[in-house]
Amino acid sequence: VSTLLKITPMAEPYACLTWQVNNFCNFQCSYCNPGNWAGDNRNNGNLQLYIDNTMKIFNTYKQRGYKHFKIFFSGGEPTHWENFIPLVTYLKEHIPNITVAVNTNLSRPLKYWQEHYHLFDDIVASFHVEFCKKDRYIENAKFLCDKVDYLCTKMLMHDERFWEVVEFGERVRQEVPNYNLEWTPLFDEMSVNAGPWKYKDPVKQSFLENAQFESVQRIDKPYRENYAVSMAHYDTGVEPVNSNKIIAARQNFFTGWKCQVDDALFINPRGDISGASCGVGQTHGNITDTDLTFDLKPVICNKQHCHCGTDIIIPKEPVNV
């Protein structure tokens, strides 16, 4: 197994804002913490304040010389947030080079994506076997796969229905012309302090350890130059970061590493802003503050286990390098 040495920006430093817009989801998966779907923080209204403060965040990075920007929306299910489309539309109009990404369960009807696909560069389509309407997922994936720069078909590996998920992944292979297929192991409770799920069946564990990220393109799709990307430096070479690969190899342990958490601000469902989602970075107020200000600085990680894909890809390296 290759040894991870460090994670760096592909070119220049880039700023990424990950926004868990609310905690309402139309799915209530058994492996997901209720904090992700309870629905008590809908965060509707305040659109202009959200726009103003989001622009203030990115303008702060611009003033520091940053040229590359990404915003990644999650939830809950962000497509059910009433501010979602108006906010994304504004950002696309006012930050022309921004990469807009969304993590969605792809449950919206096809018409939704026909109307709004042009707003998105990256779509991470999580498959949740307990609630997903499989035919709708396939229909939407087939439509989107040649409309956006990157479509990830992300299979959440439910323990009891593991092989049903594998079977659906095979259906994606057969029916979706362009796909980026990820087999994603679960985390216990899927919360800030979550540990990796223990798959007791060694066959399942072996499947995950040997599963490869699969990228297939059979038909033409848009290509967009994107510099808001991190690179993983291994003792065997350099490649784009794949957080699943790092997790499967049990190399997502960065205690003592210098991590650029404030290049990757996180907004939780209550609106609190912090460096990354792990709880190690400092807090910077709330997205609804009328006088939002913040300072940006890295941290030396004191947490044993880095569990979130958006945190794993943040540029970081051991302090003795």
Predicted regions located by residue number:
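Short pre-active-site segment immediately N-terminal to redox-active cysteine/selenocysteine motifs
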Residues: 24-28, 36
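Catalytic nucleophile-elbow at a beta strand-turn-alpha helix junction centered on a G-D-S/GDSL motif
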Residues: 23, 76-79
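Glycine-rich phosphate-binding "P-loop"
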Residues: 40-46, 72, 76, 127
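Short, hydrophobic/glycine-enriched beta-strand segments
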Residues: 15-21, 72-73
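Radical SAM/AdoMet-radical enzyme domain recognition
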Residues: 51-73, 81-182
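N-terminal active-site segment of His-dependent metallophosphoesterases
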Residues: 33-57
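Flexible mid-to-C-terminal extensions adjoining Fe-S/redox cofactors in radical SAM and related proteins
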Residues: 1-15, 35, 39, 268-321
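Radical SAM enzyme [4Fe-4S]-AdoMet core and its adjacent flexible, acidic
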Residues: 122, 126-264, 269, 274
